[in-house]
């Protein structure tokens, strides 16, 4: 039975579609290979492995054994294998200090190996939002796909792919905060409209320190955007000492004229380069 992974290989050319042995092991030879002869998959999208979950898996394997063999390929170094699928099982077996592990050896290219690792993890739905976004980006690059085509192959909405990829445009501190579960993906998406990395990191600090929820974060973003749109008032030039003396002299003279019984209508306007004084004397 063909696994959905195969839809990525050969861009639909059936004769080039390899089968993923993990899901159809009846026709594959299962070998016992040394645990210490295996190296991790360099295309592994997962960067964080939960020690607690590895420990739980190790207990299950200790009780029931390995139901599904891992999948590996030969490396250039003789007697060494690179993981294609099953890193959690391999780590669990390492913790049990087993010497050998059941495995199926495949002859996969780098592209096929990377695709299997990426898609296997995506389908397990255990990746962080950032790891998932990097996986999507890598698949788009490996197979020269559009977001829409990738969404169809994974059975996801195009908007889901797009929303995840937008997270990769956020500054590194924000991405790390998602990975470390200091903020949620929704918090991170709320920061995107700010655009300026400095503002995004500033608000990130506030979210963490004040434990802001998503709605509060969105409100803060709106306020920060409004503040950025306000144009600062142009600075007026300071009056020189001579200008102040001249204006005071004129005002005193006008005051003396009004004291004599003549009603004046005066207006003062201040411009960038000068002060305009308008005097109206009724006939």
From Swiss-Prot:
Protein localization: Cytoplasm, Nucleoid
NCBIfam families: nucleoid_noc, parB_part
Expression induction: Expressed constitutively.
HAMAP family (alphabetical): ParB_Noc
SMART domains: ParB
A GO cellular-component term linked to this record: nucleoid
Gene: noc
Name this polypeptide is given: Nucleoid occlusion protein
PANTHER family in the record: CHROMOSOME-PARTITIONING PROTEIN PARB-RELATED, NUCLEOID OCCLUSION PROTEIN
GO biological process: chromosome segregation; division septum assembly; positive regulation of sporulation resulting in formation of a cellular spore
Keywords: Cell cycle, Cell division, Cytoplasm, DNA-binding, Septation
GO molecular function: DNA binding
Main localization category: cytoplasm
Organism: Bacillus subtilis (strain 168)
């Amino acid at each position: 039975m063909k696994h959905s992974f195969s839809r990525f290989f050969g861009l639909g050319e059936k004769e080039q579609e390899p089968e993923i042995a993990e899901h159809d092991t009846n026709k594959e030879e299962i070998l016992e290979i040394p645990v210490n002869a295996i190296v991790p998959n360099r295309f592994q999208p997962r960067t964080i492995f939960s020690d607690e979950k590895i420990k739980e898996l190790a207990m299950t394997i200790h009780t029931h054994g390995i139901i599904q063999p891992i999948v590996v390929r030969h490396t250039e170094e003789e007697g060494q294998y690179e993981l294609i699928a099953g890193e959690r099982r391999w780590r669990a077996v390492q913790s049990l200090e087993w010497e050998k592990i059941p495995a199926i050896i495949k002859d996969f290219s780098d592209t096929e190996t990377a695709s299997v690792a990426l898609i296997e993890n995506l389908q397990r739905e255990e990746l962080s939002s950032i790891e998932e976004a990097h996986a999507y980006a890598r698949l788009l690059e490996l197979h020269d796909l559009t977001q829409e085509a990738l969404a169809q192959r994974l059975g996801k909405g195009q908007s889901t792919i797009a929303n995840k990829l937008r997270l990769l445009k956020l500054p590194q501190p924000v991405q790390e905060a998602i990975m470390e579960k200091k903020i949620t993906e929704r918090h991170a998406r709320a920061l995107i409209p700010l655009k300026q990395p400095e503002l995004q990191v500033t608000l990130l600090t506030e979210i963490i320190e004040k434990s802001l929820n998503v709605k509060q974060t969105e409100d803060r973003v709106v306020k920060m955007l409004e503040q950025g749109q306000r144009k600062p008032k142009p600075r007026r030039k300071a009056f020189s000492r001579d200008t102040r003396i001249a204006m005071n002299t004129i005002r005193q003279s006008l005051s003396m004229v009004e004291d004599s019984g003549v009603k004046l209508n005066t207006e003062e306007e201040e411009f960038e380069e000068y002060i305009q004084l308008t005097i109206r004397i009724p006939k």
